[in-house]
């Protein structure tokens, strides 16, 4: 559990959401990796114990994974009224490789499993209880939180609702649960109240991101009746293969046997298994909103129960036909032991070796030691972000605060060269250093067995803009209509920020000249930094544009410098100092470009779409010679 962070989508969750602020986590859903309730827990743990504390960040999933085992045990007692089945179901889940994996990986799936089996447990308690009503509260809370972790878990709740409605509407099912007909109405009211609470709280919790969720769902793995019926059928079997991996598939026949546990078929129990498994798949098929098999891991606890029952059903059948009837349940225990042995074999000899990664401590320490306080870090691979993020964030903020740049260094895989490094432009990734001379001979320093650091510039830079450029400059409208204001109420750096507000009819472009002429003797790197705050999720906070004017072959030419963002995926958010009004969180960005030799003058331009409002601060511009 204390292995390096970053695998199995942990990297995306942490970079996009986990290291942000709670308000941002709860109001953004541009990527399906945001299991909001789980992400909030991760954010809490990282703020308490540190962003790189793997144990703390994975602790919520571990706790819910352990709690899930206990809830499986309790549900087995309610569903089968057998302690031996409950013990076996507990064993099955405890050694299951998938349950182990998601109980020590910072993703929301162990929470999904816990809340789902908890909802089933409290539904059974409420269904069979004649007087107690206290189960309504945990039922409603667990139902809401299951959806707040993973929105598609609402499909599971629909399946459970159909099962409960069937139980209350079919007289023979009422008899099997010993529910008097006169209590049916009260039971229905209780369940309807819980459902209303879940629906209302889920709607309120997701209301800031409903539109964004729809867009994300459309861009995600979709299964529709018209186009991918075959994929939906494959998903039916993929869920089983996900839960029972490798040789554990041999035990699926016991799962079928468990559905028929007992001296006679318990129809409500069989119906529970079928509705929980197939109703979500049918909804996925109809709506076209689905996901990977792991999205359906709410099935794992229930399948563990029926698999345990299947071991005893098969054991009884074998004992009766082999003359071992006097050795009560010995065969079932042997089957369970065989299952546990195979599961542990997969865990020990396949799963754990597959997640072994180098200790990041050496990498983290070397990045920190080899980076000066005002160096800019270029990190080529998102996999290398996590344990260099704190240093990259700290130095970027120091560069802006001091208005000073002392060097630019790149972190690359050992097998890569600097020519492969890409910046992110509006037209896509661009290899900015490709074709430049002498870069192949740059000296590299080893960070660990897999990564290296290259210093790609000298140590002297030209700081082009003043510390309060936003307020000191003569901004003018270049095109469009709107207004711009210098603010002293919301400031991240210096004394003022710049508010750009375009009219509702036209986008607006602002421009401000950069004072001075800049003779560039050798090919140099442009480094541009800024902070922005937008007020609408759909607003595009365009990065500042650098317009250059230079003389080439006796002709003065004006052109836009090609710059692109670096370290795309490291979301650096900074909270401004508290003011008399609302306190804002700002995104801090940086971009680079290549500046050929010449004598230049420059202009900074800012773009704002119609009807939008953006704040800018921390504008800094540096020129530094390439090594």
Where is each model-derived feature located?
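Membrane-interface transmembrane helices that cradle and orient dolichyl/undecaprenyl
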Residues: 80, 119-138, 146, 168-178, ...
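Transmembrane-helix motifs of polytopic, lipid-linked glycan transferases
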Residues: 59-80, 118
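Hydrophobic/aromatic-rich transmembrane helices and adjacent perimembrane loops
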Residues: 103, 110-112, 117, 155, ...
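Catalytic lumenal/periplasmic loop and adjoining terminal transmembrane helix
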Residues: 152, 203, 207, 333-453
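Signature aromatic-anchored transmembrane alpha helix within multi-pass, membrane-resident enzymes
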Residues: 141, 196, 266-267, 305, ...
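Transmembrane alpha-helix segments characteristic
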Residues: 87, 93-94, 143, 190-199, ...
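Hydrophobic, aromatic-rich transmembrane alpha-helices
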Residues: 68-70, 164-175, 245-269
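Membrane-interface alpha helices of multi-pass inner-membrane proteins
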Residues: 89-90, 135-156, 197
């Amino acid at each position: 559990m204390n292995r390096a962070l970053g695998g199995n989508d942990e990297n995306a969750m942490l970079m996009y959401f986990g290291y942000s602020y709670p308000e941002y986590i709860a109001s953004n859903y541009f990527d399906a990796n945001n299991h909001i309730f789980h992400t909030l827990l991760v954010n809490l743990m990282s703020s308490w114990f540190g962003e790189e504390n793997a144990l703390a960040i994975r602790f919520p999933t571990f706790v819910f994974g352990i709690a899930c085992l206990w809830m499986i045990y309790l549900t087995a007692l309610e569903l089968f009224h057998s302690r031996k089945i409950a013990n076996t179901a507990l064993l099955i889940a405890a050694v299951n490789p998938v349950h182990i994996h998601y109980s020590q990986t910072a993703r929301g799936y162990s929470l999904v499993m816990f809340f789902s089996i908890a909802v089933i447990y409290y539904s059974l308690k409420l269904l069979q209880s004649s007087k107690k009503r206290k189960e309504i509260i945990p039922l409603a809370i667990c139902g809401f939180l299951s959806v707040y972790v993973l929105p598609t878990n609402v499909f599971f709740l629909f399946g459970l609702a159909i099962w409960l409605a069937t139980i209350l509407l079919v007289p023979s099912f009422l008899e099997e649960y010993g529910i008097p007909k006169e209590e049916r109405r009260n039971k229905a009211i209780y369940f309807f109240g819980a459902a209303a609470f879940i629906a209302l709280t889920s709607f309120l919790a997701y209301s800031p991101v409903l539109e964004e969720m729809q867009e994300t769902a459309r861009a995600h793995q979709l299964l529709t009746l018209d186009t991918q019926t075959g994929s939906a059928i494959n998903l039916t079997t993929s869920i089983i293969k996900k839960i029972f991996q490798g040789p554990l598939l041999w035990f699926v026949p016991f799962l079928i046997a468990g559905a028929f546990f007992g001296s006679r078929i318990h129809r409500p129990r069989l119906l529970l298994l079928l509705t929980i498994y197939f109703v979500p798949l049918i909804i996925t098929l109809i709506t076209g909103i689905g996901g990977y098999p792991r999205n359906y891991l709410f099935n794992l606890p229930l399948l563990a129960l029926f698999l345990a029952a299947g071991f005893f059903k098969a054991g009884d059948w074998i004992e009766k036909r082999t003359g071992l009837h006097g050795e009560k349940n010995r065969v079932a225990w042997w089957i369970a032991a065989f299952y546990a042995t195979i599961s542990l074999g997969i865990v020990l000899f396949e799963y754990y070796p597959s997640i072994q990664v180098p200790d990041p401590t050496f990498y983290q320490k070397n990045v920190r030691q080899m980076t000066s306080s005002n160096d800019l870090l270029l990190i080529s691979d998102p996999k290398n972000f996590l344990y260099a993020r704190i240093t990259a964030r700290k130095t970027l903020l120091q560069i802006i605060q001091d208005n000073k740049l002392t060097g630019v260094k790149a972190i690359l895989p050992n097998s890569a060269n600097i020519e492969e490094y890409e910046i992110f432009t509006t037209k896509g990734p661009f290899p900015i250093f490709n074709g430049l001379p002498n870069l192949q001979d740059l000296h590299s320093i080893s960070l660990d067995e897999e990564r290296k650091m290259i210093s790609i510039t000298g140590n002297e830079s030209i700081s082009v803009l003043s510390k309060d450029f936003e307020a000191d400059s003569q901004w003018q409208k270049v095109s469009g209509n709107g207004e711009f204001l210098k603010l002293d109420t919301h400031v991240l750096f210096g004394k003022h920020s710049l508010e750009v507000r375009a009219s509702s009819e036209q986008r607006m472009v602002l421009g401000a000249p950069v004072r001075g002429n800049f003779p560039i003797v050798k090919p140099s790197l442009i480094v541009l930094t800024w902070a922005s705050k937008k007020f609408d999720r759909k607003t595009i906070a365009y990065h500042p544009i650098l317009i250059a004017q230079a003389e080439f072959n006796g002709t003065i030419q004006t052109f836009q410098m090609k710059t692109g963002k670096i370290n795309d995926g490291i979301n650096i958010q900074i909270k401004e100092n508290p003011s008399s009004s609302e306190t804002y969180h700002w995104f801090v960005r940086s971009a680079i470009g290549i500046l050929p030799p010449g004598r230049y003058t420059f202009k900074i331009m800012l773009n704002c779409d119609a009807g939008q409002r953006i704040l800018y601060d921390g504008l800094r511009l540096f020129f530094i010679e390439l090594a």
